[in-house]
């Protein structure tokens, strides 16, 4: 019979104490073993057993963690698992709850990866300052990948759809296995040295850490860092990271995304070109309008200063001067005609014959012959002086200098202006030595 002082526990209490002891005594543990009895119910959780030749332990990996597995758990697969020891109290089952699991062999690779990444990072190979920017317009692209993988199909499909004018050279290479890293490195160095390419793309599809190990090679990482040509790395899926991703100038999460990063969409380019053309047309029309306005202003200035315009101006001035000259000549002729008429009147008043008759009468009245002779001589001198004065103002003297007096035969009126005559009219022109009949052919004022 039990001692009354001993504590009596229920199964629940005992299992709870055992669970606390296990969880408190063991931190995270790594276990390498073989999978057995793998089940995945509708809940999405993963249940299986880890075993070796002599023992086994039940394991659970709940859905949030199991969905990130990079492989499909299957019977007999050797894995490396990390988790915490616990006790399932309802059944008293001792088990390991895992938060990470990878295929066996990846553990050593992961440690090697972490060590190499830390060393290259310390050397500055991952620094953003040394990375090159991608060119704005990629014209030639080198793609280093497997010629038969899904990655190359994805890349070429996206490139053909978005920008079919791109010149693409496929440099076929192994992307998995012992010789893959050396082959990729050699192709990269040759493509870079050729100077033919604007960008070099290194890519492959997803896989385990061991499958992707060629892209964690130190020689490849240093070749990417030393390349003069910008390098894009697109290895595996979005959750996969390799050293080539860290050291490359640009890391793309997938091969398809890498292709989209490298080339623009041709539809977007067409739209941009159309917008640029519309803008250019608008600017051309604006510039043409301004140029036409300037040309019109210059044409007006040129017309105002052209020889033809100046000749027209001079012609108008000549016509004006001609009209003024004709008007002044008519004024002069009118004044001369008035003076002629006045002279004729004076001539009639001082007709020598009349004066001579008067003088003769006076002479007859004078009886001294000598006095009469002197008087006659004096009167003759006066007569000559008057005759010279009359001759100076006589129209006949003007006519003698080359002018003509034009009159109408019908009434003897003097023609003073070209506007007074009509074509075909007959006129009389008085010259120095006679008169002539003339006929008007044309008139100009």
Curated annotation (Swiss-Prot):
InterPro entries: Exonuc_VII_L, Exonuc_VII_lsu_C, OB-fold_nuc-bd_dom. Its EC number is 3.1.11.6. Its main location: cytoplasm. Keywords: Cytoplasm, Exonuclease, Hydrolase, Nuclease. GO terms for molecular function: exodeoxyribonuclease VII activity; nucleic acid binding. It comes from the Bacteria. Signal peptide: none annotated. One of its GO terms (cellular component) is exodeoxyribonuclease VII complex. Pfam families: Exonuc_VII_L, tRNA_anti_2. It is an enzyme of class 3 (hydrolase). NCBIfam families: xseA. Bidirectionally degrades single-stranded DNA into large acid-insoluble oligonucleotides, which are then degraded further into small acid-soluble oligonucleotides. Heterooligomer composed of large and small subunits. Belongs to the XseA family. PANTHER family: EXODEOXYRIBONUCLEASE 7 LARGE SUBUNIT. This is Exodeoxyribonuclease 7 large subunit. The gene is xseA.
């Amino acid at each position: 019979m039990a001692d009354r002082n001993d504590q009596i526990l229920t199964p629940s209490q005992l299992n709870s104490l055992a669970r606390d002891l296990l969880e408190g005594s063991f931190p995270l543990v790594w276990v390498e073993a073989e999978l057995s009895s793998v089940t995945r119910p509708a809940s999405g959780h993963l249940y299986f057993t880890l075993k070796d030749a002599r023992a086994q332990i039940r394991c659970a990996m709940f859905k949030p963690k199991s969905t990130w597995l990079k492989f499909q758990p299957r019977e007999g697969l050797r894995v490396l698992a990390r988790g915490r020891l616990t006790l399932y109290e309802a059944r008293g089952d001792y088990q390991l709850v895992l938060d990470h699991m990878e295929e066996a062999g990846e553990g050593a690779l992961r440690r090697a990866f972490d060590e190499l990444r830390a060393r290259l990072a310390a050397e500055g190979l991952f620094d953003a300052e040394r990375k090159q920017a991608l060119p704005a317009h990629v014209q030639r692209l080198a793609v280093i990948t497997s010629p038969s993988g899904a990655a190359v199909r994805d890349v070429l499909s996206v490139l053909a759809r978005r920008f079919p004018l791109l010149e693409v050279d496929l440099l076929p290479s192994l992307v998995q296995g012992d010789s893959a890293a050396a082959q990729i490195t050699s192709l990269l160095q040759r493509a870079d040295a050729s100077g033919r390419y604007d960008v070099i793309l290194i890519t492959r599809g997803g896989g385990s850490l061991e499958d992707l190990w060629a892209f964690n090679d130190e020689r490849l990482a240093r070749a990417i860092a030393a390349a003069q040509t910008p390098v894009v790395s697109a290895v595996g899926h979005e959750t996969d990271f390799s050293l080539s991703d860290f050291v490359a100038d640009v890391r793309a999460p997938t091969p398809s995304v890498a292709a989209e990063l490298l080339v623009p969409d041709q539809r977007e380019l067409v739209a941009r070109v159309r917008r640029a053309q519309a803008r250019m047309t608008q600017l051309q029309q604006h510039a043409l309008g301004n140029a036409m306005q300037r040309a019109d202003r210059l044409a007006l200035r040129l017309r105002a200063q052209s020889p033809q315009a100046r000749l027209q101006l001079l012609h108008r001035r000549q016509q004006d001067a001609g009209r003024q000259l004709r008007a002044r000549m008519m004024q002069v002729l009118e004044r001369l005609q008035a003076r002629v008429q006045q002279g004729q009147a004076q001539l009639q008043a001082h007709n020598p014959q009349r004066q001579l008759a008067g003088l003769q009468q006076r002479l007859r009245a004078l009886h001294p012959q000598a006095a009469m002779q002197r008087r006659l001589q004096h009167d003759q001198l006066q007569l000559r002086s008057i005759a010279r004065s009359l001759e100076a103002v006589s129209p006949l003297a003007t006519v003698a200098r080359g002018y003509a007096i034009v009159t109408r035969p019908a009434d003897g009126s003097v023609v003073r202006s070209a506007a007074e005559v009509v074509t075909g009219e007959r006129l009389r022109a008085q010259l120095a030595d006679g008169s002539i009949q003339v006929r008007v052919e044309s008139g100009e004022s």
